[in-house]
């Protein structure tokens, strides 16, 4: 195959989402609270569809299963990437994700090893990574007593 695959992908509304995907990047969005654009996805909650060429109309998960040669003959049982573009217009929740081994064993799907590339950010934007507590119990207790919100 000598041409790239262009994908029709899925938008996900989030309480913390915004309009930047439309206003700054030109995407058509279904509401003013779009938080995630799953640009490349074979995840059951939002599978990309091929838009062009001989595979037009085919779902990415099916294409991966039936034409592994297009993906370098990868050995993972399911397509191994989920590429998202986020619009975080408000605070995000604390995130804890399993690795692939734990995810497959306990949740039936791959884990979520992450890599971030910040495209744009407001001047007062923060990323909080890690913590200074000496025990997990103290860290979790401190988080629960501070700004805990079931909606973040």
Label each PLM-derived region with a short phrase.
Residues 1-133:
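Transition-metal
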Residues 135-139:
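A short, charged helix-loop
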Residues 141-152:
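Positively charged, low-complexity/disordered segments
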């Amino acid at each position: 195959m000598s041409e790239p695959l262009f994908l029709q992908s899925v938008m996900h509304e989030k309480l913390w989402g915004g309009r930047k995907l439309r206003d700054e990047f030109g995407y058509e969005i279904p509401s003013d609270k779009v938080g995630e654009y799953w640009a490349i996805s074979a995840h059951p909650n939002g599978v990309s569809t091929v838009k062009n060429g001989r595979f037009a109309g085919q779902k990415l998960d099916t294409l991966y299963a039936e034409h592994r040669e297009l993906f370098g003959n990868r050995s993972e049982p399911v397509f191994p990437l989920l590429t998202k573009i986020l619009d975080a217009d408000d605070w995000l929740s604390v995130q804890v994700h399993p690795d692939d081994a734990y995810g497959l064993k306990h949740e039936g799907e791959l884990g979520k090893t992450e890599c971030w590339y910040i495209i744009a950010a407001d001047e007062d934007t923060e990323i909080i990574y890690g913590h200074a507590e000496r025990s997990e119990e103290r860290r979790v207790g401190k988080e629960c007593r501070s700004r805990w919100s079931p909606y973040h």
